[in-house]
């Protein structure tokens, strides 16, 4: 705790130095981070992620390293323009003055990152925080210790402690950090823990970004290309072993295409991972025994609540392995239809009318993502207008996260605030309003004493301006 307090004090004192840094100085720090992730420590990160939960090297490159590099490149290209004051209109009554908005750093920031994409969801927000001119303390997840250790090396090699520091450890470290008056907290994790983080932040009135989760519905109607829908959903669901906050969480399939969809889904899953999935080098593992047992409990509950296993259902306890699993026929009481799954199990429900789907989705919390496979513009329009979600992909899954020109985040229970690109820069910035008087102020005419003439001028101003 002493080290944490000392670093927090040092960063608090250093925040104005970083806050006044130029775009080129911030870009220099981003270049150093990019080089470390892309080149110097790339192999170390690949090996660490494989040790933590057998993440395939290609998936590490595609879902961990590339997104960070892509984010940094976008920031470097646009940062100078983002930092410029934004001129805005000034009402006529304030003639003789100008108005503008400046982006100032929030100050000392805390990033609490998760285990499912530890590199991506640590260094992505860090890039935004650096771009905005903040000092940062990072608390990575203890569930991926090998990766956390490599990230600690990177932070120590690239930054001074008063600029960026990383503290490894369990929940007690996070609790110690949350007791401090950070200016901003960026948390990625579950809604349950998100509420704890927000409660701690409220004690200091710290602003928060909460990237949470939820049950992301995936709709397929009869007009969709069934084969393509099955392929893209299987890919999005089983990527990272289903441990993705925006993974398809449950399927809503139009009744008439159920059997055709299941056949196509099984075909593509086998193509991705072969007949013997447990031996595939492209299929990862559940992060630890606790989460493995949680998922097995879901499978046991499904059997008691009408579930029919259409595919998979196999597991190897010694490896934290669960095969890609598709389940249909569940009753409303099944936990798979209530809890965010965060694993390679996908429940399937059918519908006859799109209105049923909309009502079902709206009966729950707003999801982090919603996926719709349809060729009908009217259906697409109807679903978009009558549901709420943090993000949506139409005729694809998961890909919306990878576009750094789009804001990424949830809505209410699935999150507060946005990340990526300009939106991430703004999230770590305070939009400071400035009015600059440079000549006579018309407002002086309306200052006390309030004479009859000033009353008429006030009425005239209200009417016309």
Model-derived regions, located:
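Conserved C-terminal structural/oligomerization subdomain of aldehyde/semialdehyde dehydrogenase
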Residues: 21-22, 314, 321-465
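Rossmann-like NAD(P) dinucleotide-binding subdomain of oxidoreductase/dehydrogenase enzymes
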Residues: 92-228, 351
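Residues at or immediately preceding the N-termini of alpha-helices
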Residues: 4, 23, 42, 226, ...
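ALDH superfamily catalytic-core signature
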Residues: 192-331, 394, 455-456, 462-464
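Structural signal for hydrophobic packing residues in well-ordered secondary-structure cores
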Residues: 15, 34-37, 41, 53, ...
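Residue-level signal for inorganic ion chemistry
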Residues: 26, 72, 133, 164, ...
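N-terminal Rossmann-like NAD(P)+-binding subdomain of aldehyde/semialdehyde dehydrogenases
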Residues: 1-100
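Short, well-ordered beta-strand elements within core beta-sheets of diverse protein domains
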Residues: 13-19, 111, 218-220, 250-255, ...
């Amino acid at each position: 705790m002493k080290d944490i307090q000392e670093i927090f004090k040092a960063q608090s004192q250093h925040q104005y130095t970083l806050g006044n840094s130029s775009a080129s100085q911030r870009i220099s720090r981003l270049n150093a981070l990019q080089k470390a992730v892309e080149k110097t420590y790339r192999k170390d990160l690949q090996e660490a992620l494989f040790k933590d939960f057998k993440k395939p090297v290609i998936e590490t490159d595609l879902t961990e390293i590339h997104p960070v590099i892509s984010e940094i490149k976008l920031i470097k290209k646009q940062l100078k323009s983002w930092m410029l004051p934004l001129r805005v209109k000034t009402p006529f009554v304030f003639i003789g003055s100008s108005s503008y908005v400046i982006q100032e750093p929030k100050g000392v920031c805390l990033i609490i990152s998760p285990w499912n994409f530890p590199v991506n969801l640590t260094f992505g927000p860090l890039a935004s925080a650096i771009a905005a001119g903040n000092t940062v303390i990072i608390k990575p997840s203890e569930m991926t210790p090998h990766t956390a250790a490599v990230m600690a090396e990177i932070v120590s090699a690239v930054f001074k402690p008063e600029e960026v520091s990383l503290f490894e450890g369990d929940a007690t470290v996070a609790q110690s950090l949350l007791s401090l008056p950070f200016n901003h907290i960026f948390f990625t994790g579950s809604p349950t823990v998100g509420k704890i983080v927000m409660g701690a932040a409220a004690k200091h009135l710290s602003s928060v970004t909460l990237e949470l989760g939820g049950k992301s519905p995936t709709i397929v109607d009869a007009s969709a290309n069934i084969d393509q829908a099955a392929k893209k959903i299987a890919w999005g669901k089983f990527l990272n072993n289903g441990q993705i906050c925006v993974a398809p969480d449950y399927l809503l399939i139009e009744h008439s295409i159920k059997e055709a969809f299941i056949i196509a889904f099984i075909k593509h899953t086998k193509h991705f991972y072969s007949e013997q999935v447990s031996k595939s080098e492209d299929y990862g593992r559940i992060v630890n025994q606790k989460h493995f047992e949680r998922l097995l409990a879901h499978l046991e509950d499904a059997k008691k609540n009408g579930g029919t296993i259409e595919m998979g259902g196999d597991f190897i306890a010694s490896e934290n392995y669960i095969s890609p699993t598709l389940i249909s026929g569940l009753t409303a009481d099944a936990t798979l239809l209530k809890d965010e799954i965060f694993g390679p199990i996908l429940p399937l429900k059918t519908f006859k009318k799109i209105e049923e789907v909309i009502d079902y989705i709206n009966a729950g919390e707003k999801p982090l993502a919603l996926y719709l496979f349809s060729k009908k513009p009217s259906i697409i329009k109807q679903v978009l207008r009558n549901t709420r979600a943090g993000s949506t992909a139409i005729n694809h899954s998961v890909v919306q996260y990878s576009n750094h020109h789009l804001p990424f985040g949830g809505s209410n229970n699935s999150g507060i605030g946005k990340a990526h690109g300009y939106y991430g820069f703004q999230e770590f910035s305070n939009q400071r309003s400035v009015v600059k008087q440079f000549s006579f102020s018309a407002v002086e005419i309306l200052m006390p004493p309030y004479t009859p003439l000033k009353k008429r001028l006030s009425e005239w101003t209200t009417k016309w301006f």
